[in-house]
A protein has these predicted regions:
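Intrinsic-disorder/low-complexity, polar/charged segments
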Residues: 22, 171-173
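Cytoplasm-facing regions of membrane-associated proteins and arrestin-like adaptors
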Residues: 135-170
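Single conserved hydrophobic/aromatic residue that forms the stacking wall/gate
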Residues: 174-183
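Charged, low-complexity, helix-prone segments enriched in Lys/Glu/Asp/Gln
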Residues: 94-99, 156-164, 177
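Transmembrane and membrane-interface helices of multi-pass
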Residues: 1-147
């Protein structure tokens, strides 16, 4: 499953590279993004005892209200990760810049193609049974178990696939308000 985790990160890196029109900027962004996400995953698990899930973004306002009550301690691992991330970013800053497109028209076409590719990937992600094909079984009652078994990236995407907020079939506002009309 390590290769599958790396594959997901690689695909995300390609999308970011196409949108930013630069491998160097994309790699800098991805390094900072993954460091920040590792902090989110760490602190959510530390404070709540449960893994961070995509659905948690819906309750971000509540999290912002209660975050002041927690004590954030910076561990040696966090410091080491931060220093490593900054060294990698520094290496990327010294690397040669490579752009996929130089003219404005080509940049726009590149981003439209990247958006179409992302849409196609999202539709495949949601509608194909990719997780069963790779043997990934999502434990929706205990996402942390899924993360531990298959890796954080694959576990997060597998659990997020089933965490969509969709209304039940046949349910509408009219059906809900009908039983309450006589009262």
């Amino acid at each position: 499953y390590a290769l599958l985790n790396i594959g997901v990160i690689f695909v995300l890196s390609i999308f970011v590279s196409l949108f930013l029109n630069s491998i160097r900027r994309a790699m800098i962004f991805m390094n900072i993004f993954y460091f920040c996400m590792s902090l989110v995953f760490y602190y959510v698990y530390l404070f709540r005892g449960e893994a961070f899930q995509l659905i948690d973004l819906y309750s971000i306002a509540t999290a912002a209200d209660v975050v002041g009550g927690y004590k954030f301690e910076i561990t040696g691992e966090i410091v080491t990760s931060f220093i490593t991330m900054m060294l990698v970013v520094r290496l990327w800053l010294q690397s040669r810049e490579y752009r996929f497109a130089r003219k404005t028209r080509n940049k726009i076409l590149l981003r439209v193609a990247a958006a179409a590719l992302m849409l196609g990937t999202y539709l495949a992600y949601m509608n194909l049974n990719w997780n069963a094909e790779f043997g990934v079984i999502s434990d929706l009652w205990n996402p942390a178990k899924t993360y531990r078994q298959y890796g954080t990236t694959v576990g997060f995407t597998a659990v997020a696939k089933y965490m969509r907020l969709t209304p039940p079939d046949g349910l509408s506002l009219i059906h809900i308000s009908e039983p309450t009309r006589p009262y």
